[in-house]
Design a protein with these regions (language model features):
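Pyridoxal 5′-phosphate
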Residues: 1-424
């Protein structure tokens, strides 16, 4: 692991050489890692290695290649369980409680469609925050509609903080499920998911955590968080696209029906009926992206062992602080969210006064600066914030960025202002 003090030296960059796209395209300042991360060479090599040395369908063959592929999927499942603290009292990974999906969205849909009908009835309440990504909102809208339940929202204060008072006011005897992102993909703020979980558990309810923006940046422990379910995607954590994770408490997963049916998720099938395989196989119908799962293991090893969460946190905090200070010196830039840069975990949302975010992003692209512009799949939040055009710009930084990337962003923003307003 890299020493955190070394990692925090943002005028140096020991990481870009590990990322082929960044190393091969020095003209790019990639500041959109909240949408998807770049992949280190070891991840690309791992996917190729799978196809070259063990390409076979896991779980479906008794020959050596298939057995090897099956073993590797199991190994990565254990690796994920350890990563998120899903271990028993003796520290052994509870791998059977790790379900591989396509992405965070599918993981959250699986909980909403398969778990909520087992506990939700007319008159109950599901609690979410106004900061949720659409993937952690729309499934609960549909679940409430199907059950006759009510969707209740937790709102932050003016700094984006959900207070104890708000939690106490919104979570009550009718609350059966609460779903919240650990880190907002727009504001970058970390939500008090532990407090929310404690409140919902006190009412006999269940806590669903969207870890898409937290797992890539910080250590996550499902027990410490009080999670009953946790969802995240590999592609935001240096892994391949198309691989998601759902962890759930075993008793809850065991009681849930599958969302998809088909090959290898069954125990037995007759002409008129079928029974299901145990967890996790019953939620993994059909052939999975075995090479992607294998490469995900390599990605998580690079993130947690080669770099280390302590170094990730130190470097990203230094980068955000530097970017927040430099962008704050531009009087035409409107920063969004908490005034303390330390509350923005890798994410800075902003607008350029009088310029549509899409125009900002297009002009930045001409300078090789890659950011996101739009509603960020969080329209209710932007509506609540009163953001003009229901859109904003977002620069999201990762440990493989450096001071030069931020300087290029600031220079390009100055160019945006010049294009639209001249040099006054």
């Amino acid at each position: 692991m890299l020493d955190a003090k070394v990692a925090a030296k943002i005028d140096e960059n020991p990481f870009k050489q590990d990322f082929p796209l960044l190393a091969g395209h020095p003209e790019l300042a990639f500041l959109d890692s909240a949408a998807t991360a770049q992949r280190p060479a070891c991840v690309l090599d791992a996917e190729r290695r799978f196809y070259e040395t063990m390409n076979a369908n896991p779980l479906r063959g008794l020959y050596s290649l298939s057995v090897a592929a099956t073993a590797e999927i199991g190994r990565v499942r254990e690796q994920v369980a350890r990563l998120i603290g899903a271990v028993d009292e003796d520290g052994r990974p509870l791998a059977q409680d790790v379900v591989f999906t396509r992405n965070t969205s599918e993981s959250l849909n699986l909980v909403a469609k398969s778990f909520s009908p087992t506990v939700l009835k007319a008159g109950d309440e599901v609690c979410v925050t106004i900061m949720e990504h659409h993937s952690d909102l729309i499934p609960w809208q549909q679940a409430c509609r199907a059950a006759g339940a009510t969707l209740v929202f937790l709102y932050p204060n003016e700094d984006g903080v959900i207070t104890d008072k708000e939690i106490a006011a919104k979570i009550g005897p009718k609350t059966r499920i609460c779903a919240a992102a650990e880190v907002s993909n727009v504001l970058g703020i970390r939500l008090p998911v532990e407090k929310i979980a404690a409140a919902v558990h006190a009412q006999g309810g269940y806590m669903v955590i969207d870890g898409a923006q937290s797992v890539p940046h910080m250590a996550v422990d499902v027990r410490a968080l009080g999670a009953d379910f946790l969802a995240f995607s590999a592609h935001k954590a240096l892994g391949p696209m198309g691989i998601g994770v759902l962890w759930g408490r075993h008793d809850l997963l065991d009681a849930m029906p599958p969302m998809l049916t088909g090959g290898e998720m069954i125990d037995s099938v007759t002409e008129q009926d079928a029974t299901w395989a145990p967890v996790p196989e019953k939620f993994e119908a059909g052939t999975q992206d075995a090479a992607g799962i294998y490469a995900t293991g390599e990605a998580l090893a690079y993130l947690t062992q080669t770099v280390g969460y302590e170094a990730v946190a130190a470097r990203e905090a230094a980068l955000v602080a530097y970017a927040w200070e430099r962008m704050g010196q531009l009087d035409f830039v409107e920063l969004i969210g908490h005034p303390d840069a330390s509350q923005h975990h890798g994410v800075i949302s902003f607008n350029v006064r009088g310029v549509h975010p899409h125009d900002v992003a297009s002009i930045l692209d001409m300078s090789g600066v890659c950011i996101r512009a739009g509603h960020h799949c969080a329209q209710p939040l932007l509506t609540w914030l009163g953001v003009e055009n229901l859109a904003c710009c977002r620069a999201s930084l990762a440990f493989y960025n450096d001071q030069n990337d931020v300087d290029r962003l600031v220079d390009a923003l100055t160019q945006v202002w010049t294009v639209f307003h001249g040099r006054d």
